[in-house]
Amino acid sequence: ASNSYPTMKLIAKRYELKTAGSSGQQHRVILIPGSSGKHYSQIMNGAPFDVFFSADIERARLLEQEGRILAGTRFTYALGRLILWSSIDNYVDSKGDVLNKKDFRYLAIANPKLAPYGKSAEEALRSLGLWTNLKERLVRGENIAQTFQFISSGNAKLGFVAYSQIMNPGISIDGSFWEVPQSVYEPIEQQAVLLQDSDIGREFLSFVKSDESLSIIYESGYGLP
């Protein structure tokens, strides 16, 4: 999932260092970011991934139902948090009332058909009674990373992204944001699965569940399962 890419880079680096120290043979983790929907399609078409980190339950569950994962390996690794963000300081208020203004041309969301955070953004807008008024102003990113770029570049004045994206360790993110109440969208349970019968894959997933990794996940702006 694109939203968890920076977090997974930190976890993968920590894992690689740990394996080098314990066994003398460092395991290398190759991360391939993209929308959960796109990766799901690639896996169904035979992409040789070992592990899949989705931004939702749905794709992980579908892969399980299709017999594409190792039995008993599906688990929740993080709870996503949706925010409305603008790269402009003091533009987004603490209640999200900016959505009722008419001074922005575009509102960015990830494609709801491909990206779980886009689906959550649509759910939130519908729950808040704003979908009808704002749907013509929506610009859709293929994934949450592209959606973030739309906003950070100024092509969209504001949009819905993952809280983890502005909590990216080592990078100072300017702007203003409102954390969307979790009562207006379905919980974003991000799940992982093991796709290949691999000892290293099992070991890496076990490391993701460790207190060391959970601390990284929490500090990156996620809730813990």
Explain the meaning of each model-derived region.
Residues 1-33, 37-47, 54-57, 61-67, ...:
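Exported/periplasmic ABC-transporter solute-binding proteins
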Residues 70:
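Extracellular glycoside hydrolase catalytic/binding regions
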